[in-house]
Amino acid sequence: MDDYEVVEQIGRGAFGSAFLVIHKSERRKYVVKKIRLAKQTERCKLAAIQEMSLISKLKSPYIVEYKDSWVEKDCVCIVTSYCEGGDMTQMIKKSRGVFASEEKLCRWMVQLLLAIDYLHNNRVLHRDLKCSNIFLTKENEVRLGDFGLAKLLGKDDLASSMVGTPNYMCPELLADIPYGYKSDIWSLGCCMFEVAAHQPAFKAPDMAALINKINRSSLSPLPVMYSSSLKRLIKSMLRKNPEHRPTAAELLRHPHLQPYLAQCQNLSPVFKPVVSKSEHNTNENRTGLPPKTKSAKTPIKHNQESEETEKKNKDTSSSSKDKERPAKSQEMSVISTLTLLREFQKKSPKSEERAEALESLLELCAGLLRQEKFDELEGVLKPFGDETVSSRETAIWLTKSLMNVKRKQNDDETNI
């Protein structure tokens, strides 16, 4: 620590503290993370040493920059770049209910996906993706940090330890099933939902209720200001079956993210869209995601060969035939929205605007119906009819409409 001046303590956790420091000769700000080794189990000590070793080898523009590390007085000290914007949790609190623009949200999502794709391509599973581990620079770019729970996977390996933060844990981890890279995709989906909605994707008063919500993928509607494309991207990361979740590389190929991807640093050409218009339409209609692609290979210094970590996962196009059944009201809302959107999108750009408005209306109505707020539901739908209708009639009409669309969706799947 002789080369640094301590300015203040900026964080404290179960295993250590973080300090804002200034390098004496460079006069540049850094963060020193001190991880206590005294009174820790051998497993915790090993994790601290592993974090020090791992982060020194990571080289990505969207991962916190490593500066130095050492061991002193039963502590592991890790020096990384300082992000003036704080973390995403702090950003949400400071916004005071004002939602971020879709442009900003998409830019952050792309940067995080590039960081995760880099990690996965180098066999690193983060395992603790959450808003407090995502940092913002003064230029409003993201940096992924805190690799204390990260794991380096061997070829075809899966992880099995139950680690992480409960609200961001995927269903397979909670079910004590070995998990892989798709667990990070789930956690990122939780983060993006929270940044968009200013509330956790899954929240409950106790662990049993939380697990139940996660297993049912019981999500509240996202704010109406965001497009249906962005909402579908976030929800695709929160599919219960990991085989039906897209990889980071697949998400980066989505047409909706291309304008933001082009603005990123050190962009690999493999993420540029190359599918024909007909192929693009086919994939959009069935899954909302483009076909699989190989991710960019940027090896880190441990010199293990990069691999196509998700090659055994099924194509995300199977998501249209997903046999899992979440809560009925949630499923009906999603199915009806997607079916109507597809019909509108075949017509004109004006129809797309109407489709997005319709999606927001249906999500709101489904939420009110689920909560049995029939009076509010009546108020929402009253402008669409010439005569006043009772809340009971409104609820019956909405339920029948959603069920009819569901039947149509099932018929369409049977005919494919």
UniProtKB/Swiss-Prot annotation:
Signal sequence region: none
Domain Protein kinase: 4-257
Catalysed transformations (reactions): L-seryl-[protein] + ATP = O-phospho-L-seryl-[protein] + ADP + H(+); L-threonyl-[protein] + ATP = O-phospho-L-threonyl-[protein] + ADP + H(+)
InterPro entries, A to Z: Kinase-like_dom_sf, NEK_Ser/Thr_kinase, Prot_kinase_dom, Protein_kinase_ATP_BS, Ser/Thr_kinase_AS
Binding site for ATP: I10, G11, R12, G13, A14, F15, G16, S17, A18, K33
UniProt keyword annotation of Transferase present: yes
GO biological process terms on file: cortical microtubule organization; lateral root formation; negative regulation of ethylene biosynthetic process; protein phosphorylation
Gene3D superfamilies found in the cross-reference section: Phosphorylase Kinase, domain 1, Transferase(Phosphotransferase) domain 1
Keywords: ATP-binding, Kinase, Nucleotide-binding, Serine/threonine-protein kinase, Transferase
Region (Disordered): 277-334
Entry annotated with the keyword Disulfide bond: no
Biased composition (Basic and acidic residues): 302-328
SUPFAM superfamilies named among the record's database cross-references: Protein kinase-like (PK-like)
One Gene Ontology term of the molecular function aspect: ATP binding
Active site: D128
Similarity comment text for this entry: Belongs to the protein kinase superfamily. NEK Ser/Thr protein kinase family. NIMA subfamily.
Biological role: May be involved in plant development processes.
Protein's name in the database: Serine/threonine-protein kinase Nek6
Organism: Arabidopsis thaliana (Mouse-ear cress)
Gene name of the encoded protein: NEK6
